[in-house]
Amino acid sequence: MSGSNPAVSINKKKVAPVVLAILDGWGYREEIEHNAVRQASTPVIDALWHAYPHTLIEASGADVGLPDEQMGNSEVGHLTIGAGRIIQQELVRISNTVKENKLIANPALNQFSQSLKKGGGTLHIMGLCSDGGVHSHIKHLCGLIEWAASKGLKNVSLHLFTDGRDTSAKSATKYINTIEAKIKATGVGEISSLCGRYWAMDRDNRWERTSKAYELLTDPRFAISKLSAAESINKSYQEGITDEFIEPVRLSSSFLKDGDGVVFFNFRPDRARQLVKALKLKDFDGFERKNKTDIDVLTFTQYESGLPVSVAFPPEPLNDLLGQVIADHGLNQYRTAETEKYPHVTYFLNGGIEKPLKGEVRHLVPSPRVATYDLQPEMSADELTESCIQAIDTGIYSLVVINFANPDMVGHSGIMKAAIKANEKVDSCIGKLLNSIGKLGGSLLITADHGNSEMMIGPDGQPWTAHTTNPVPVILIEGEKRKLSGYGNDIKLRESGGGLADLAPTLLHLLNLPKPKAMTGKTLIEPINLPKKPNLIPQPAY
């Protein structure tokens, strides 16, 4: 899918662009062992790292508005990059509410419970059951169970999605034990179904996956297992199936019926939208719904504007973001990514705004239709690169943002050889991209939104499928037509104290645009006094 914006201005003279290349999941770790970044053959990025200004910046924890030691993620990373400031993320916002026992005072939740009690329906609580902190947190689920008990809701069914992606591949049992203990302590609720996130949380329009989760939740004929939740998980392990891929299993007679209510406690929108759309949209064409239900749905955060649901924690508006500054100065910008990361370079980078800005053109390159990306580690990087080069060659875009999904999406597989191939493909694409940028005298800023593929085996010796808290690299290749004036004869990048919030100020610096006061991040660029030399674009090695 590509889009043209009628508000895009066309200049006869070609623009030297500033290009931001986000290598999703390309973290930095010194150790070579189990490191798919260090073990990959990456001649282009290696050469750039040694020849051009570079540094490391933080992309996790407090530096991106998350709790200390909490791994970063793509949503938070792109939001922070676009905002140019540290924003308190939904994980922290909701966690504080739960910790302070303030769920009981949440207006949306209270109205929801009153309506449900009046109608006599069952409360269904669903979401990702883990402490990964990327899409949800088990403490929020525990808080909801306590909230339901405080409101006198007796009929409470839990539909839990197992993780194994942002957590260890075989960790579901400990989370189930935690929830069963909370159920016992409060006297409220039962675990009615289990389902791997692979089925319940697809975001790539693979509706055949979503339909399996939908049937589990709504089909009265769905078979009820005689096994307990823990027994079902262990049975999956015996069959070689890890948490992410656990087949849908119903554990009780409870399913969604007319008059019931659903609370979806995932706070990250992108992997929750499809299932909510299947449950609530009247005009829905993802798959044939055999068991339509008339239910109320409350989501923890706003998954998408216009969805017919209640929202417990509505978005807090952000102003003066990177894209807005570009648009306000009458400049054109181009955003592109594969399906898996398209929302991140558009919706999240723009602070949760769906509609393109004036002068903003978006281009989506379909991700390959494979079960898991280790089967095709190159993904659609070549097509993505070629489409981006075509956009750069038009000479109309001042800012270009491209996201390479490979290091993250293949890194999540936990398969070392595939992750190495993924990183090598991205390296070759950077070389091609650099040639195109250099022809116009533009600048390239290379970075990542969080770590992942630099750590493929965890401390327990098992495949590491989650993100990391490692820093990420930044490399600046300053183009001949984008040389900064008033900075001596050369530049360097700040050696320490940097974070993702500093990238937008750095990009505005390169574009010679003023930084809004709301952006508390600072440019990473610092002057040094060296003999002037041409900033030649190296030839790609591929």
UniProtKB/Swiss-Prot annotation:
Cofactor: how bound: Binds 2 manganese ions per subunit.
BP GO terms, sorted: glucose catabolic process; glycolytic process
Single GO term (MF): phosphoglycerate mutase activity
SUPFAM superfamilies in alphabetical order: 2,3-Bisphosphoglycerate-independent phosphoglycerate mutase, substrate-binding domain, Alkaline phosphatase-like
Protein's pathway: Carbohydrate degradation; glycolysis; pyruvate from D-glyceraldehyde 3-phosphate: step 3/5
Catalytic reaction(s) noted: (2R)-2-phosphoglycerate = (2R)-3-phosphoglycerate
One Pfam family named in its UniProt record: Metalloenzyme
UniProt-annotated binding residues for Mn(2+) 2: D24, S74, D449, H450
Signal peptide: none
Binding locations of Mn(2+) 1: D408, H412, H467
Active site (UniProt): S74 (phosphoserine intermediate)
Broad enzyme group: isomerase
Keywords, sorted A to Z: Glycolysis, Isomerase, Manganese, Metal-binding
EC number(s) recorded for this UniProt protein: 5.4.2.12
Role of this protein: Catalyzes the interconversion of 2-phosphoglycerate and 3-phosphoglycerate.
Subunit structure: Monomer.
Family, as annotated: Belongs to the BPG-independent phosphoglycerate mutase family.
Name of the protein in its database record: 2,3-bisphosphoglycerate-independent phosphoglycerate mutase
Organism: Prochlorococcus marinus (strain NATL2A)
